[in-house]
Amino acid sequence: MIVGYRSTIITLSHPKLGNGKTISSNAIFQRSCRVRCSHSTPSSMNGFEDARDRIRESFGKVELSPSSYDTAWVAMVPSKHSLNEPCFPQCLDWIIENQREDGSWGLNPSHPLLLKDSLSSTLACLLALTKWRVGDEQIKRGLGFIETQSWAIDNKDQISPLGFEIIFPSMIKSAEKLNLNLAINKRDSTIKRALQNEFTRNIEYMSEGVGELCDWKEIIKLHQRQNGSLFDSPATTAAALIYHQHDKKCYEYLNSILQQHKNWVPTMYPTKIHSLLCLVDTLQNLGVHRHFKSEIKKALDEIYRLWQQKNEQIFSNVTHCAMAFRLLRMSYYDVSSDELAEFVDEEHFFAISGKYTSHVEILELHKASQLAIDHEKDDILDKINNWTRTFMEQKLLNNGFIDRMSKKEVELALRKFYTISDLAENRRCIKSYEENNFKILKAAYRSPNIYNKDLFIFSIRNFELCQAQHQEELQQFKRWFEDYRLDQLGIAERYIHDTYLCAVIVVPEPELSDARLLYAKYVLLLTIVDDQFDSFASTDECLNIIELVERWDDYASVGYKSEKVKVFFSTLYKSIEELVTIAEIKQGRSVKNHLLNLWLELVKLMLMERVEWFSGKTIPSIEEYLYVTSITFGARLIPLTTQYFLGIKISEDILESDEIYGLCNCTGRVLRILNDLQDSKKEQKEDSVTIVTLLMKSMSEEEAIMKIKEILEMNRRELLKMVLVQKKGSQLPQICKDIFWRTSNWADFIYLQTDGYRIAEEMKNHIDEVFYKPLNH
């Protein structure tokens, strides 16, 4: 039966339902952190549409918070005409006007774990003010802040900006040259290490921390981008002008930023690609992307255009490259894993990027590596997957993540993405979403167009609306269950929840309520049929059921072998006739023969399994076994029937096409193998036929399991390829293909990477969170 959902028994009590590309660009290497705040759940539709309109507008905005650190470095650039005058005096004005009450500079509002960031930004601002002999009062207050907070310099619980251990001590040296008296203990280990450090390679991104020791001419030659910057970093580009004052393109780059922001600069620029990638990813994670389909398509079209052009905003940055690959591939764009080939070797990766690589780059590479769609050619992704997985697992073992959210993100990424329920993940992302979320490079920053009150409230309200719809549909499903007295056929009421959860994962679109309920009903009906042919009915009764289906419109003349068959067929007949009526209204044509043929094919093969295989009369080949059992598992019946309820008219020719056959075949193999891997020991004891027992006739159990996992992965990749890659001449709408992939996802979700069922309590909590528990709990 489909996805083997009955293997997990859940008892859930609820009053509503009764009982029961050169890597040296570290400029986007960043850590995402969140500031927790209380959730205020909107109780009505007030503002929902307005918030949606404002979110749509955010696609046209590129917003990043001011960086005190980078602005200070730009402020230190001398005029082209006089070394005694600032080139950008407006930045000095901004520094003077934006000192915080405690005497510091940095992200506003700040965060208790960002003291190192504040210390770095404050010292940079003090250097700028002291260099140009302005802001005496601000300097005094800034020195006071550094004196009182210098304990944080070597504190391991504090989040460090990238390159802090190089840049901060270097700025201390610069302060000494300017006779700026810092009350800092130079015996602090961070400072001591850096002052004794012989600078080596892989530190170009934080070259401002190396200063005069850098070969700036060589750095500009090797790393200057088309926009004139070094690594899209205003601070590093400014440092090039401070220590090597002869580059017109660097000046033009900084001028272009100040033309936009007047008197301050962000910590990276340009930010359009970064903002678009993060915004699309965030909308998907929050589960609200369906409200912004046209905006997301326009954004991804732009990213794909740049991908094809090998634009440096994507390919000079690990995070951008990996994220673009993942978002584009999962959105049906043709992208090749060849573009990630530079990252296949861990040693090479770290040799180029150095130790200043945060977990975000590794995390994004790992996410991208899970999207292999070709067993022969995607060894690039396999190699990336292997070393990134090992790296992150080691990080977890060593407790190498400073904040809880980073650790959680890595734990989720280490589970295959197709084993994670989107619904639960949407809830988790909403719960952890914060308006004051920040990320950190050499300075902490925020993205107001990605993290804001509008998106927060909109996501909550969207989740509430979906949750309310699910509760209403569950009521309908329960009434159907009771009206057809399915409990009399061995189906306990407790299966309502997990069956419906299956349907929600496969058909999540709110507007497809009929398809979702059809899917859930068919899973239960298939379970009943499976029970009858597996153990509840005799062979004569099974033959009786087949004849009743064959003579569907004249079933009364067939008669019943038993009362049990009568009750069963009566339920099956009424249910299917009801669904046929709805399907024919939606399609505007007769679909009854096609649906009945699917049922007839299924029950005949179920009988063959029972009479021929399970009795030991014949032993099927591996191919025959997988073909037959994929059908009896429901991999044709349920997805194909669901196609009629997806809001589009679909011809019988399409549903009988080779493309559909391939989708059914791969889906069925994935479902069957996952089930057999779980049940192998139990089935061996019962002397039943499984792919495990068949392979063990010629090899050991360990070898059989290994071989089966290879077959599983091959079919999963082939299925993903058929769903994601646009086949020339295909007439099958994308939503029809998606049903097959999501069906396999549900099986992976249940079997959890083939190492054990989700325990009942975990599934109960999952159902509770998705269907009932308010977000503020």
Swiss-Prot record:
<keyword id="KW-0934">Plastid</keyword>
<feature type="transit peptide" description="Chloroplast">
    <location>
        <begin position="1"/>
        <end position="36"/>
    </location>
</feature>
<dbReference type="Pfam" id="PF03936">
    <property type="entry name" value="Terpene_synth_C"/>
</dbReference>
<dbReference type="GO" id="GO:0102060">
    <property type="term" value="F:endo-alpha-bergamotene synthase activity"/>
</dbReference>
<keyword id="KW-0456">Lyase</keyword>
<dbReference type="GO" id="GO:0009507">
    <property type="term" value="C:chloroplast"/>
</dbReference>
<keyword id="KW-0460">Magnesium</keyword>
<dbReference type="GO" id="GO:0102062">
    <property type="term" value="F:alpha-santalene synthase activity"/>
</dbReference>
<dbReference type="Pfam" id="PF01397">
    <property type="entry name" value="Terpene_synth"/>
</dbReference>
<feature type="binding site">
    <location>
        <position position="530"/>
    </location>
    <ligand>
        <name>Mg(2+) 1</name>
    </ligand>
</feature>
<dbReference type="InterPro" id="IPR036965">
    <property type="entry name" value="Terpene_synth_N_sf"/>
</dbReference>
<feature type="binding site">
    <location>
        <position position="534"/>
    </location>
    <ligand>
        <name>Mg(2+) 1</name>
    </ligand>
</feature>
<feature type="binding site">
    <location>
        <position position="530"/>
    </location>
    <ligand>
        <name>Mg(2+) 2</name>
    </ligand>
</feature>
<keyword id="KW-0150">Chloroplast</keyword>
<dbReference type="GO" id="GO:0000287">
    <property type="term" value="F:magnesium ion binding"/>
</dbReference>
<dbReference type="GO" id="GO:0102061">
    <property type="term" value="F:endo-beta-bergamotene synthase activity"/>
</dbReference>
<feature type="binding site">
    <location>
        <position position="534"/>
    </location>
    <ligand>
        <name>Mg(2+) 2</name>
    </ligand>
</feature>
<keyword id="KW-0464">Manganese</keyword>
<keyword id="KW-0479">Metal-binding</keyword>
<comment type="function">
    <text>(2Z,6Z)-farnesyl diphosphate cyclizing enzyme. Produces (+)-alpha-santalene, (+)-endo-beta-bergamotene, (-)-endo-alpha-bergamotene, and at lower amounts, (-)exo-alpha-bergamotene and (+)-epi-beta-santalene. Not able to use geranyl diphosphate, E,E-farnesyl diphosphate or E,E,E-geranylgeranyl diphosphate as substrates, but able to use Neryl diphosphate to make the monoterpene terpineol.</text>
</comment>
<dbReference type="InterPro" id="IPR008949">
    <property type="entry name" value="Isoprenoid_synthase_dom_sf"/>
</dbReference>
<comment type="similarity">
    <text>Belongs to the terpene synthase family. Tpse subfamily.</text>
</comment>
<keyword id="KW-0809">Transit peptide</keyword>
<dbReference type="GO" id="GO:0010333">
    <property type="term" value="F:terpene synthase activity"/>
</dbReference>
<dbReference type="InterPro" id="IPR001906">
    <property type="entry name" value="Terpene_synth_N"/>
</dbReference>
<dbReference type="GO" id="GO:0009686">
    <property type="term" value="P:gibberellin biosynthetic process"/>
</dbReference>
<dbReference type="InterPro" id="IPR008930">
    <property type="entry name" value="Terpenoid_cyclase/PrenylTrfase"/>
</dbReference>
<dbReference type="InterPro" id="IPR005630">
    <property type="entry name" value="Terpene_synthase_metal-bd"/>
</dbReference>
<dbReference type="InterPro" id="IPR050148">
    <property type="entry name" value="Terpene_synthase-like"/>
</dbReference>
<feature type="short sequence motif" description="DDXXD motif">
    <location>
        <begin position="530"/>
        <end position="534"/>
    </location>
</feature>
<protein>
    <recommendedName>
        <fullName>Santalene and bergamotene synthase, chloroplastic</fullName>
        <ecNumber>4.2.3.50</ecNumber>
        <ecNumber>4.2.3.53</ecNumber>
        <ecNumber>4.2.3.54</ecNumber>
    </recommendedName>
</protein>
